[in-house]
UniProtKB/Swiss-Prot annotation:
Composition-biased stretches (Basic and acidic residues): 16-25
Protein name as catalogued: Small ribosomal subunit protein uS8
Protein family according to the UniProt entry: Belongs to the universal ribosomal protein uS8 family.
Alphabetically ordered keywords of this record: Ribonucleoprotein, Ribosomal protein, RNA-binding, rRNA-binding
Self-association state and partner proteins as the record states: Part of the 30S ribosomal subunit. Contacts proteins S5 and S12.
Length: 133
């Protein structure tokens, strides 16, 4: 079955694994999924990224992070913003601040995929892919 929105699929896999307290989750590898995973790791939502397989069967293995004695997920919510049917673009001044700066908006810019903070620093806008907090 064809996957028409691989970014939504990635976010759903991470969200489900996090809610079930799984150590890792596997995601089909692509340039976009690697970029999003690197931003999540840089922002502290994912512990480690590795790859398994080769060719078009390559998968990203994401090691999820939890906090505290009761292993609360560091990812509380992930929301897809720009969808295939309705793309959402923002300029530098229009980039959203998620929970007053506690969350992250992941932006696809002309300089690559980055967090909203990095996009503001570099003075670029782009497509708002998702919110993570």
């Amino acid at each position: 079955m064809a996957n028409h929105d691989p970014i939504s699929d990635m976010l759903t896999r991470i969200r489900n694994a996090s809610e079930k307290r799984h150590e890792t989750t596997r995601i089909p590898a692509s340039r976009m999924s690697r970029s999003i995973a690197k931003v999540l790791q840089k922002e502290g939502f994912i512990a480690q990224i590795s790859e398994e397989g080769e060719g078009f069967k390559t998968q990203l293995v994401l090691e999820l992070k939890y906090s505290g004695k009761h292993r609360h997920p560091t990812i509380r919510s992930m929301q897809r913003v720009s969808k295939p049917g309705l793309r959402i673009y923002k300029n530098t001044r229009g980039l959203p601040k998620i929970l007053g700066g506690l969350g992250v908006a992941i932006i696809s810019t002309s300089k690559g995929v980055m967090s909203d903070r990095d996009a503001r620093k570099q003075g670029v806008g782009g497509e708002v892919l998702c919110y993570v907090y």
